[in-house]
Amino acid sequence: MAELKTVARPYAKAVFEVAREQGHIVEWADMLNVLASVTVEPKLKKALGNPAFSAEEKANALADVCAEVTTEQGKAFLLALAVNKRLSLLPAISELFLQFKLNFEKAVNVQFTSAFELTAEQTQALAASLAKKLDRTVNLTSETDASLIGGVVIRTGDLIIDGSVRGKLAKLAEAINS
């Protein structure tokens, strides 16, 4: 997966710069999200990998399937990807584009998992605390997982803060066994 992101990064960065300069970041994010979700469908994925179809046919087919969101620049981007045999990178390009978008907006997606459901006040306090610590606007997604026993696990990008009882027990067991 890391290799895919390495190859996808220049494409995502280039398309993000174009979108930013033209003020169409949201439109490009939506378009890339739809294109990425469509390209993982097994039948379409097989067709896009079929060497019997030309790059132009593949790009046009994908643009037609996603006609509601695909712009002329989007079609040109798809053609460039198809010519370079990079249509399979669309999910990674979309994910990286979203990261660039969040960074540009000084925002971050945070996944918060707790053993018990938090109240609205606790959730707001957590979001405010994380926003201050990360110096970003926080888009908080929360879920409960009773297997944590107690405490919380916070994930954002590569940062994971494991304050769960399960995590502490695992660390203790590792220390005892080593």
From Swiss-Prot:
Protein location: Cell inner membrane
Keywords attached to this entry: ATP synthesis, Cell inner membrane, Cell membrane, CF(1), Hydrogen ion transport, Ion transport, Membrane, Transport
Gene3D superfamilies: N-terminal domain of the delta subunit of the F1F0-ATP synthase (1.10.520.20)
Gene Ontology CC: plasma membrane; proton-transporting ATP synthase complex
Topological category with respect to the lipid bilayer: Peripheral membrane protein
Superkingdom, natural source: Bacteria
GO molecular function, one term: proton-transporting ATP synthase activity, rotational mechanism
InterPro entries: ATP_synth_OSCP/delta_N_sf (IPR026015), ATPase_OSCP/d_CS (IPR020781), ATPase_OSCP/dsu (IPR000711)
Assembly mode: F-type ATPases have 2 components, F(1) - the catalytic core - and F(0) - the membrane proton channel. F(1) has five subunits: alpha(3), beta(3), gamma(1), delta(1), epsilon(1). F(0) has three main subunits: a(1), b(2) and c(10-14). The alpha and beta chains form an alternating ring which encloses part of the gamma chain. F(1) is attached to F(0) by a central stalk formed by the gamma and epsilon chains, while a peripheral stalk is formed by the delta and b chains.
PANTHER family assigned to the protein according to its UniProt record, in alphabetical order: ATP SYNTHASE DELTA CHAIN
Matches recorded under NCBIfam families: ATP_synt_delta, PRK05758.2-2
Homology family: Belongs to the ATPase delta chain family.
Function: F(1)F(0) ATP synthase produces ATP from ADP in the presence of a proton or sodium gradient. F-type ATPases consist of two structural domains, F(1) containing the extramembraneous catalytic core and F(0) containing the membrane proton channel, linked together by a central stalk and a peripheral stalk. During catalysis, ATP synthesis in the catalytic domain of F(1) is coupled via a rotary mechanism of the central stalk subunits to proton translocation.
Protein name: ATP synthase subunit delta
